Amino acid sequence: MLCLTGYVFVYTSGRADNPIRSDGFSYYVYLPSWFLFHDTTLSSVARDCCGGVYPAYTAIIRWPTTRRWVNAHPIGVAVMQAPSFAVAHGLTRWTNLSPDGFTLYYQHAAGLSGLFWVIAGLMVLSRLLRRHFADPIVAATLGAILLGTNLFHYATFDSSYSHAYSFFLFAAFLDLTERWYGGPRVRTSVLLGIVAGLIALVRHPNVVFLIVFPLYGVERADLLRSRVALLWDHRRLVTIALAVAAFVIAPQLAFYYQATGRILVSSYGDLGFNFTTPRILGVLFSVQKGLFFWSPILLTSCAGLAWLLRSRHSARAFVPPALVFLVLDTYIIASWWDWQFGGSFGHRGFVDTLPIFAIGTAAFFERVSRQPVTRRVVGVIVFLVIALNLFQMLQYWNHVLPFSDTTWEQYRRVFLQWH
């Protein structure tokens, strides 16, 4: 209800334009093109909605050799939006509105779809955490992750972006990985393949998250050999998961081939990564979208993961893949040409990884809950950090905080100012 209330507030108070905007437009555009215009080339939407040429902000470009449209944003979000799109289309036809893919019902179907997947992600994450932590710890962790980071923003204000969907998929992949190692089955393998394929289909760089599966529970280097042996013993199930993932990814490769004549392309054109000069400190600590500057609550996760690494806790199995993934993911994000990821509240590149951070935060809360004085002090600090995060989120919604390239001077000038 809190997320839904936030969504309604955003779109009834004039805080945001239509949900399908900016990156959200590019992720969504496949649906009207495919199902309303029966066009897999994206040309019809360009002609009917954009005057024949997609605006530069969409990152939908003409491929130099074929002159066909190539969308930098893959089809995964559209696939996960398809059920809500079908409902919106039915309501649009029933109420005699224009079935062009961008009228009222389509707009809010796309927005509410993102909200739905965030809620679903929280439910899956809750189930995962309850296998390792007491209910009060789980409730506190989910509250901290939802309200103390930019997750609430991407569940409401910018819910048509990919991050809401990746949040769910990451939580589901963690849950399924643990269930698979608890008892490998065909059903779990199929679900792992579907989720793995969607992770790659929603945002290609997130494929690195799949490293969680082979490294789960590998707490020492000498265990790698036994892990390889285990996966080989269950090679039929691993093959099933890989085959399902390949089937899920295949439509994207077909789209690339149709548009460019290749199955693998750099859809951002000349834009890309600067792997030799990553902005790691900026990505983590700067006022320009630094992860821990804008979401200091996540420092609890760092402390919790460090404690888990030295403990015999049942959640320790997640720590090795979590640490490897977080290092790789931070390096990839910091190497992107626009390491701030454009206009956003906080660093949106890390919203996808919040299920990993949630495990560390839960461990931290469990640890401090054993000492009454420490628990009260931490509780006050967490409350204040969440309050600051929500206030700054509202500042962003009110256009008080800059969308990007925030400087210390700007931040100090508007700190705790409502308008």
Regions found by a protein language model. Give the residues of each.
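Hydrophobic, aromatic-rich transmembrane alpha-helices
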Residues: L122-M123, L224-V228, F293-R316, F357-F364, ...
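Aromatic- and kink-enriched transmembrane "portal" helix at the membrane-lumen/periplasm boundary
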Residues: P99-G121, V138, L142-A172, L176, ...
